[in-house]
Amino acid sequence: MDEKIAVMDTVDANFKDEWLENVARVLDGAKPDYLVVQHMEPDHAANIENFMKAYPDTTVVANTKTFTMMGNFFRNLNLDGKKLVVANGDSLTLGKHVLTFVFAPMVHWPEVMVTYDSTDKVLFSADGFGKFGALDVEEDWDFEARRYYIGIVGKYGAQVQKLLKAAATLDIQTICPLHGPILTENLGHYLEKYDIWSSYKVESEGVVIAYTSVYGNTKKAVELLAQKLEEKGCPKVTVFDLARDDMAEAVEDAFRYGKLVLATITYNGDIFPFMRTYIENLTERSYQNRTIGLIENGSWAPAAARIMQGMFEKSKNITWLENNVKITSSLSEANEAEIEAMAEELCK
């Protein structure tokens, strides 16, 4: 405890009682002076009003945009005389500890800010450096953090890059995100991953094959391609049936690896709905700097390849394979040769 006590953010509405009990236990009879609100999304801000009922003399610390949102979420919350509005770069002295506020707009909401404690060298990073999963489960940080980043923040790479540049000027020894574990070791690894993800670089060499298949013929083509790639020593091949597998993992791997093959049918003059959803998930998150190959199947008037390619027209730095595959109902010998050529090109 310091001369002044600051509580950082609140929690989801479902954890109200547990959280308030934990706060009271840590305070051990003391009263908090400040509630710092970094992010207004309800999974972190839902208990602001409940906190103020429990500790009515607390001053809420936030920026102007946050207070506007707070009024929209909590129509009956009266904070007259209990607001401290901060600007980017402002500091708040608690005694030994000094908190500095760094604005991080669109990481991933417009009001977001992070807070740096220069005494203990702690970065309270809001949603940044968070991950999915439970704290009592041993798992690879990169996997769930990558999926979290791409799903939640993936569209806002430029804004994350700006925040990383600001963070590079700070001596950070601990990162406290609003999701997932507190990070205390090997911080360079986490910063490096965020730099890769937010600049849309290829993280690992490999090929992702994402497909939909109604009667199994497109699936056979995908299985043959995967077999050929493995035979040729491709470093990593992952295959996703978009109608059955986890869409979020398929999106994650598309951003992780450098090459992507999309295989689907022509369906009602369009592409199969799961494939459309998948591509939209990629393009909405600024998918770029990748190589894409196409496998289309149509019993008559095939249009899937043209439609899929058109969906990436606004994506940056997409390289299209020269060798694509056009199936008419079922695999032919010519198709098998096309798949061989596609595998060869993908392995270059």
Language-model region placement:
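Structural motif
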Residues: 4-6, 34, 97, 121-124, ...
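Active-site neighborhood of phospho(di)ester-bond hydrolases with catalytic His/Asp-centered motifs
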Residues: 8-10, 32-40, 60-63, 123-127, ...
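Metallo-beta-lactamase
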Residues: 62-112, 156-162
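FMN-binding flavodoxin-like domain, especially the glycine-rich phosphate-binding loop
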Residues: 135-175, 179-182, 224-242, 250-348
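Short N-terminal or domain-adjacent regulatory/targeting segments
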Residues: 176-203, 277
